[in-house]
Structure formats: C-alpha cells, structure tokens
C-alpha cells in the first residue's frame, strides 16, 4: 500500500510539472482531397502562410517548412517573401499572380477559425483511508490539494491551393490543446507542423 501511495504522489508530481511547463497537443479532425478541383501536380514550390496576426506566426511557418523539407518537399515561409501583408480583400486573381511572380505553384493557408479558453479542475490524490486518532472513524490522507489549469483550444482550417487553377485541392481541420500559454504555443509548433505535414503526406499530392 505504501508503494502505491508513493507511486500516486510521483504521478501527481509529474502531472503538476507538465501543467506548469505547458502541454500542447494537436489532432486532425478531418481531411478532404479535391475540395474545389482535383490536384494537377507535380508541385515543385510550395509557400506556407499562417493567416493570423500573432508574433509566433513566423516561428510556426518556419516549423512547417522544416517538416516539409524532411519529406523532400520544397517549401517557403510566406513571411520571408511577403512580410506581414495580409490577404484581406485580395482577389484570387491577385493572389495567384503574386505567388506565380515569386515562383510558387502551390500554397498552404492556415486559418485560425476559433480560439477559446477553458478552466480544468485537477483533483488531488486523496491517498489511503486511515483512522482518526482515538476513534474508529476512517478518513483519507490528502497528499495534494485540487488545482485548476487554464487550457487554450485552437480550431484551425488548412487550405492547400493549386495556384494555376486558383482552387483548393486539399483541406483539413485540426484542433490543438495548450496549457502553457505563449511558451506552450512556441514549444508546440513543431508537433503541430509534424501532424499537418503527415496528414498532407498521406494525401499523396506532392
């Protein structure tokens, strides 16, 4: 029993450290190929753009480009070519022309569709029941108090474009969970990149 108590305390300590340092996970909800038109590859030069105003935008784009490179796919982070210019109000003709001018035949657009925060209650370990001194009443030993963790949830839509056709040829949706705030997002960029590049890889478009 004592070994079990020590194991529970150790497990709780690990959980507490994970929450303090930031936990980040991304999952693919669904994917679809041939959304507007079918892929007409081969595609030789992809531009990756995170269409959200955030100081980690460049960090995320770079992480995705690095993952594509590991798969043998030539990709470029949009911020290194187009800076911080958004696409709000720009026509498909204009965007396609700009991308073709810079040698891109495909584009991955990352849209943040929803962001919300939830507070999660983590129950402390009650331990084993022990008798109250001088009585026959049993009560649990409490090794740790309950505590609360703030979790940020991000719902993302991914659009893969064929520039020449001006059409979405693949689309995916992901949900990410983050408890580490800014640091959690920074640490989670690599995992997010791995998840979405693997999903695109399974579509066998490149």
Which residues are covered by each model-predicted region?
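A generic local structural motif
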Residues: 2, 32-35, 93-95
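C-terminal/domain-edge helix-coil "capping" segments
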Residues: 19-43, 138-206
């Amino acid at each position: 029993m004592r070994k079990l108590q020590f194991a529970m305390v150790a497990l709780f300590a690990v959980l507490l450290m994970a929450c303090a340092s930031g936990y980040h996970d991304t999952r693919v909800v669904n994917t679809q190929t041939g959304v507007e038109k079918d892929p007409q590859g081969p595609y030789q030069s992809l531009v990756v753009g995170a269409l959200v105003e955030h100081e980690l935008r460049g960090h995320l784009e770079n992480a995705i480009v690095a993952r594509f490179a590991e798969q043998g796919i030539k990709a470029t982070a949009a911020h290194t070519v187009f800076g911080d210019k958004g696409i709000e109000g720009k026509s498909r003709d204009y965007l396609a022309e700009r991308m073709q001018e810079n040698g891109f035949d495909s584009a991955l657009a990352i849209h943040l569709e929803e962001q919300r925060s939830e507070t999660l209650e983590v129950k402390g370990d009650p331990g084993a029941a022990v008798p109250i001194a001088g009585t026959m009443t049993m009560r649990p030993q409490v090794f740790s108090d309950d505590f609360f963790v703030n979790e940020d949830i991000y719902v993302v839509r991914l659009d893969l474009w064929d520039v020449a056709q001006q059409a979405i040829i693949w689309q995916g949706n992901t949900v990410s969970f983050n408890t580490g705030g800014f640091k959690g997002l920074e640490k989670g960029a690599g995992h997010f990149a791995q998840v979405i590049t693997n999903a695109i890889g399974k579509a066998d478009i490149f």
